[in-house]
């Protein structure tokens, strides 16, 4: 896999290097004079704002690689860097598509990750969103408060998921707005 192929192709089409770097799609993390594809060898998820506009990306690694001699492991998920358009703390994955269904039933299913939301959507659950990791934030809570009265937390059953469920309940109970269930 050539991690510079996309950059080289866009550069050949006269895209501005500065804009390419600001896009978050590329990184110079490896200390080279050339930009590398940040999401190489990953499944890419477009991250859309509430209006449905793609503002960032997240990539899930396809194959876990063993640690190199520095002990470095690649992260399972890698997001675009935060920008004026994208702040992970303010963001709920799939909110743009789920909002009308959430409002119609005044209920939201809160999942841990993208794959959970996608699987639920394929099974007919159209009111699902993901908190982009294992922690619901106050900012995400404010978004949900404006949209639903009932929240069903469907985080993973592993230890991090259980701890995240406890933290989410603490945040959700502070505003006394939600009827909270755990799935």
Segments the model singles out, each with a brief description of its role:
Residues 165-175:
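Conserved acidic, small-residue-rich alpha-beta core segments centered on
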């Amino acid at each position: 896999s050539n991690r510079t192929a996309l950059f080289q192709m866009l550069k050949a089409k006269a895209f501005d290097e500065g804009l390419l770097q600001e896009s978050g799609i590329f990184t110079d993390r490896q200390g080279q004079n050339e930009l590398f594809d940040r999401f190489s060898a990953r499944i890419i998820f477009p991250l859309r704002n509430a209006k449905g506009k793609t503002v960032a990306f997240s990539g899930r690694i396809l194959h876990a690689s063993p640690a190199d001699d520095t002990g470095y492991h690649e992260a399972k998920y890698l997001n675009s860097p935060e920008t004026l358009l994208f702040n992970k703390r303010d963001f709920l994955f799939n909110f743009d598509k789920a909002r009308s269904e959430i409002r119609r039933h005044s209920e939201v299913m809160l999942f841990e990750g993208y794959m959970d939301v996608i699987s639920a959507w394929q099974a007919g659950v159209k009111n699902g969103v993901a908190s982009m990791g294992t922690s619901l934030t106050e900012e995400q809570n404010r978004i949900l408060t404006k949209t639903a009265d009932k929240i069903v937390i469907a985080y993973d059953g592993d230890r991090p998921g259980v701890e995240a469920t406890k933290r989410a309940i603490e945040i959700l109970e502070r505003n006394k707005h939600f009827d909270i269930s755990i799935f």
